A protein has these predicted regions:
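Short, small-residue-enriched loops and turns at beta-alpha junctions
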Residues: 82-87, 160-166, 195
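N-terminal glycine-rich anion-binding loop in soluble enzyme alpha/beta folds
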Residues: 1-63, 128-168
């Protein structure tokens, strides 16, 4: 093992997601001390239809995770947000299964987001998603169940994942402003196929509240975890 090699972040990505990889690269250390490696699982549209929900079957994700293990990554991140509408226990089960099958530490974007909300003490949030009403309702209910009130919500009403990636930064920022019209403790941009990372600092200065972008929060947590993890052989 080369003790000087970069730490390797393995990411499980929805197959039609075209945002998270370029956004992740922007957030990694400029010195090259961490590299990102991606395995994909088929996800082409997001809705409350049963066929859409089945895209996030644990067994499918495990196949993709096992391929990442072949690259001897040091950490595996499920970089999707489906647990926000499937139920937060979905990602807890997935992370446990990945760790059990691969022996590699794992986390998820939703786990990172919820840990950040807890750290901030955020109990009222503004929610920005590209999703349809049925998914938004599930997300709001799931956050209510963990003591977080969605005080303002703005959605894009899209189901095709490739269309979600086309939402521009100006539109994302406008959605965040709308979600912050009522007093909130934080704004959550919930979707790893929304290019919200680059507008976070601008929005935080403008709105004077923390703004949590899914990709950014996930990468920040992973960098913290990688600092604790030894390099794999």
């Amino acid at each position: 093992m080369n003790p000087l090699r970069p730490k390797r972040l393995g990411m499980l990505a929805p197959s039609s997601n075209t945002v998270l990889e370029p956004e992740t690269v922007k957030l990694l250390p400029a010195n090259g001390s961490v590299t990102a490696h991606v395995s994909r699982l088929r996800v082409v549209q997001v809705s409350a239809e049963e066929s859409s929900l089945q895209q996030f079957d644990l067994d499918r994700a495990l196949v993709a995770a096992e391929l990442l293990a072949d690259a001897k990554v040091d950490l595996i991140l499920w970089n999707g947000t489906a647990a926000s509408w499937l139920g937060f226990d979905h990602d807890e089960r997935l992370v446990s299964a990945i760790e059990r099958h691969t022996g590699i530490r794992a986390t998820s974007a939703v786990i990172a987001i919820n840990e950040r909300l807890t750290r901030l003490g955020a109990r009222r949030i503004g929610l920005v998603t590209p999703y349809v009403a049925a998914l938004e309702e599930r997300i709001i209910d799931n956050y209510r169940d963990i003591g977080v009130t969605v005080a303002g919500a703005v959605r894009g009403d899209l189901t095709e994942n490739t269309a979600i990636a086309e939402i521009g930064q100006a539109e994302i920022a406008a959605m965040a402003r709308e979600a912050a019209r009522t007093p909130v403790d934080a704004i959550l941009i919930l979707c790893t196929n929304l290019a919200g990372s680059s507008v976070v600092r601008q929005l935080e200065q403008e709105l004077n509240v923390p703004v949590l972008d899914s990709v950014r929060v996930a990468v920040e947590q992973c960098l913290e975890l990688l600092a604790e993890e030894p390099r794999r052989a």
